């Protein structure tokens, strides 16, 4: 269980999260997993209209599904549009996702969204160090996504030369978060 001190969005379910990767964080996956109490972070490519329609047609998914955005202006516009369309009373979780969370803009966006939408549970990542975990929490993130480049299908390590062993990252980030 996750009890959020900042909003009424307390999560009670299976502590497994389907990633917002292409082919994983889909509407179909969210519908199927929500029946089992499993959380889904949707992919960032859905439009505001698609998201509004999905959550209108599937209110049960509001309990354990996060809208995902990046840090581009179009992503922020998408978030504002979804919140403005009356869906604001149902959107509880937001995943702010970048492949490598080590930029000043990333922490700034987390802080701006926290100030604008205090009721949201913000999931932010991806990071692999205690310092950035701490920065995101101080900026307003409730949950920090940990991991850069450890997966077998992840291309971040190959394309950017940035990666970190997953267990080491979890240990370091969990220590900083506590």
Where are these regions (language model features)?
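Active-site entrance/lid segments in N-terminal catalytic domains of soluble metabolic enzymes
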Residues: 1-178
């Amino acid at each position: 269980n996750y009890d959020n001190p900042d909003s009424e969005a307390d999560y009670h379910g299976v502590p497994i999260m389907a990633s917002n990767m292409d082919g994983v964080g889909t509407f179909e996956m969210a519908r199927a997993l929500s029946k089992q109490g499993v959380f889904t972070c949707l992919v960032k490519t859905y439009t505001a209209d698609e998201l509004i329609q999905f959550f209108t047609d599937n209110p049960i998914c509001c309990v354990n599904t996060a809208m995902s955005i990046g840090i581009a202006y179009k992503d922020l516009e998408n978030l504002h549009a979804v919140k403005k369309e009356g869906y604001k009373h149902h959107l509880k979780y937001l995943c702010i996702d970048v492949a490598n969370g080590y930029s000043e803009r990333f922490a700034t966006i987390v802080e701006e969204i926290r100030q604008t939408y205090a009721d949201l549970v913000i999931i932010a990542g991806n990071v692999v160090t205690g310092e950035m975990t701490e920065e995101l929490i101080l900026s307003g993130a409730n949950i920090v996504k940990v991991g850069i480049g450890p997966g077998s299908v992840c291309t971040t390590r190959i394309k950017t030369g940035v990666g970190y062993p997953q267990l080491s990252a979890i240990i370091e980030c969990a220590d900083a978060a506590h």
